[in-house]
Amino acid sequence: MAQIDFRKKINWHRRYRSPQGVKTEHEILRIFESDRGRIINSPAIRRLQQKTQVFPLERNAAVRTRLTHSMEVQQVGRYIAKEILSRLKELKLLEAYGLDELTGPFESIVEMSCLMHDIGNPPFGHFGEAAINDWFRQRLYPEDAESQPLTDDRCSVAALRLRDGEEPLNALRRKIRQDLCHFEGNAQGIRLVHTLMRMNLTWAQVGGILKYTRPAWWRGETPETHHYLMKKPGYYLSEEAYIARLRKELNLALYSRFPLTWIMEAADDISYCVADLEDAVEKRIFTVEQLYHHLHEAWGQHEKGSLFSLVVENAWEKSRSNSLSRSTEDQFFMYLRVNTLNKLVPYAAQRFIDNLPAIFAGTFNHALLEDASECSDLLKLYKNVAVKHVFSHPDVEQLELQGYRVISGLLEIYRPLLNLPLSDFTELVEKERVKRFPIETRLFHKLSTRHRLAYVEAVSKLPSDSPEFPLWEYYYRCRLLQDYISGMTDLYAWDEYRRLMAVEQ
């Protein structure tokens, strides 16, 4: 096992215009303060205020959006980071681990990773992801990429259809089709900060949001040693070279994770489990009394002094005894949140320290709060009650189905841009208006300038005389559409769909 030295991981250099001659702790901290400013002031963070946490298109400001959720995750991440550093200081290990002058950057990277952890999520959350992937699967049929004979391939895009005698072009076609059918919010987050927003963050800060290490074009089983780290796509083909450079800069082996990402993940797990239940009470899906009984029933038999007793029952009893000063609802969730944090944060911090050799190497193949402990059972309890009584509620399911229809409908509306032959789409990009393509011209004008420029830049770097050019051009054209639609807020996507379907009231 490699020696633990965080000076080899907390890399403050950037992809472009990297700071030179940095030596002191104060100078290093200023670099990460610059990252904080870039992140907090970015449009991607602002858009989170109109993206779904659990309840799409919610008008009640007391119910969480992705932004308010991310701010809560940021605070929990800060708490865990401080707890880790405090415990390492007590053990006199800060200097041994190269952290004695990097405590500020350590905390800042965790905080900003938490704030950014959802920036790549499309409108309507996981149902938005499913809509994008289903729509592209119905067009590209990635499962046919291994079909024999090749004439069985049902892909509707000529450039990406497999052809006899065209290896290695067929290998690239398989990768592209698989990649485009695996849109994922975490992978889109990497694409946002590097390719679309060009935030030029430090290598360490970007490493903090690389939650999953599986490329989106991966086919087949993942290695047993990395099956948890690779359970979802973490980056796209378009960012392959950037991620390769990131691994080099952060001393990460293939498919390994940056150490501070485990803290961000734990903070997210702790935050959303309680928050989803609180939002459900705010939405009157159930009362606090009903929630308590759901939790009690799901946990089952327990003894006095058990974690359930110390966290949930304690919160219930305290909220009932002080009902005159604040509402029972407010008091119950205040105590539940405090009790949960006071048990789970120290546990997550100790798990991080106990497994630091594997975490530092990036190979710890688990979440900090997924084990056989009571702390893990408590999180599972919150999640299971939410799945059974919140996510399956008719109002929630109806809104999710509407969100799925909106995203699918928008993709269908913009489909003419994908149907244009390469030469015609190139003409449209160059001229921005082509008389014989009135619909496509107007659709193209609606695309964000930022996304159009990202497409132009990517295609301009391709050798136009290469047989791979039509494949890559179509890939980036699909990315253009995915970038645009996934970057919408819930409300904008809803309104845009109604406008373009001519059903605006």
Swiss-Prot record:
Keywords associated with the record: Hydrolase, Magnesium
Matches recorded under InterPro entries: dGTP_triP_hydro_central_sf, dGTPase, dGTPase-like, dNTPase_1, HD/PDEase_dom, HD_domain
Coiled-coil regions listed in the entry: none
PANTHER family: DEOXYGUANOSINETRIPHOSPHATE TRIPHOSPHOHYDROLASE, DEOXYNUCLEOSIDE TRIPHOSPHATE TRIPHOSPHOHYDROLASE
Reactions that this protein is recorded to catalyse: dGTP + H2O = 2'-deoxyguanosine + triphosphate + H(+)
Domain named HD: residues: 66-273
Organism: Escherichia coli O6:H1 (strain CFT073 / ATCC 700928 / UPEC)
SMART domains: HDc
Record keyword Manganese present: no
Subunit field text: Homotetramer.
Protein known as: Deoxyguanosinetriphosphate triphosphohydrolase
Stored CDD domains: HDc
Family note: Belongs to the dGTPase family. Type 1 subfamily.
Entry superkingdom: Bacteria
Lineage: Bacteria, Pseudomonadati, Pseudomonadota, Gammaproteobacteria, Enterobacterales
Enzyme class per UniProt: hydrolase
GO molecular function: dGTPase activity; magnesium ion binding
Function: dGTPase preferentially hydrolyzes dGTP over the other canonical NTPs.
Needed cofactors: Mg(2+)
Protein's GO biological process: dGTP catabolic process
EC number, UniProt record: 3.1.5.1
Pfam family, one: HD
